[in-house]
Structure formats: structure tokens, C-alpha cells
Amino acid sequence: LLDSGAPTDEEAARRVLSKWTDLEAFVAYAVVDRAIHHDDGPFHWYCIDGPCEPHNFYFYEEPASRRVHIIPWDLDNSLQGWTPEALNPVTAMPDAFGDTSNACDPFPFGSFNLLQRSAGCDPLVAAWASLDDEFERIDNNFRSGPFSIESVTMHVEGWRDQIAPHVAEAAALHDDAPSVAEWNSSVDQL
């Protein structure tokens, strides 16, 4: 995918990624991934028992168009780590998207000091992260649109209204179910 000088040349990166991906969708994936803190996915390179590598995603190639798409999975640790106190000791990431640390050598990080390497040291991630204009435009649109406080609050409140009767029913029937007050408190944290 990246054998055309893309990691060091922004125009080459754009050219190569445009050839093999839907560039808008590829950048939008990175925007959403970083916005929801999918810190246990393609931008977290663990160095445990072998080479440093990311996980929890697949690349899918459409045979007819020969376009590559990234498919995330195992997003259970997403939407965590909004504050330093809430950082997950395993999935905590030291670098912003595309940044590098420790001259690209593995280093311990997080409260468990897990060995990891900056994702920006990978040629594909470096090329991806070099698309600053696209990233900024898509990120601004995302954060002022579907990920805005108003939009997210509207959806969460709608889901609260749909789910609340079932939470009350479960709380009345099961001793181990959260109370309605506990559930509402958790929803309010969102």
C-alpha cells in the first residue's frame, strides 16, 4: 500500500491513499476513532511478547474496486479516558494522532508501564496523519454536527426515554439490577 514514498511526502501520501482508499472515509474513520477514544485499536501499538503491533481492526479489500476499508471491532474500551483520573491502565495512549515518542523505539507507558510504540512511527499511520487539512475539516464537521453536545444529548435523552421503563421493570424484578437512580446517574455521566 505504501511503497511510493508516502510516509515522508504529504502529496505522495495523498496520492497513494487516494488510489487505494476512499480518502474521505479513511480520514473520517481516524476522526471518529480519536473522538471516541478507541484507544485499543489501530492507533495503539503494543509491544508485548513479540513485535509491536496494533489490533482490533481488519482491512477489507473490495475485489472489484481494489479499495481498502478499515473495519474496527472490540470497541468496548472506547469512550473512556476523558480525564487523567479515568485513563484505562492498559489502553492509555501517550501520543496525539500521528505524533511520535522515544525516537520510535518501544517505551513503557501507563500505570501498568506496558511496552508500546508510537503509532505515528508506522508508515501507514504517518501517511494517514499527514492529511491535516482533511482531518481538520472532517473533525470540525463531526464535532459541530453529529458529535456536538446538543446532538449527543438529544440522542442520549431519546434513548433514556426508550430504555427507562425497562430499567424500572428490571429493578423491580431483580435484586442485582441497578436501581433507576443508579441508572439515571450513569446516563447523566454520558
Feature map (PLM): residue ranges:
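Middle-to-C-terminal accessory/interaction subdomains
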Residues: 1-57, 62-190
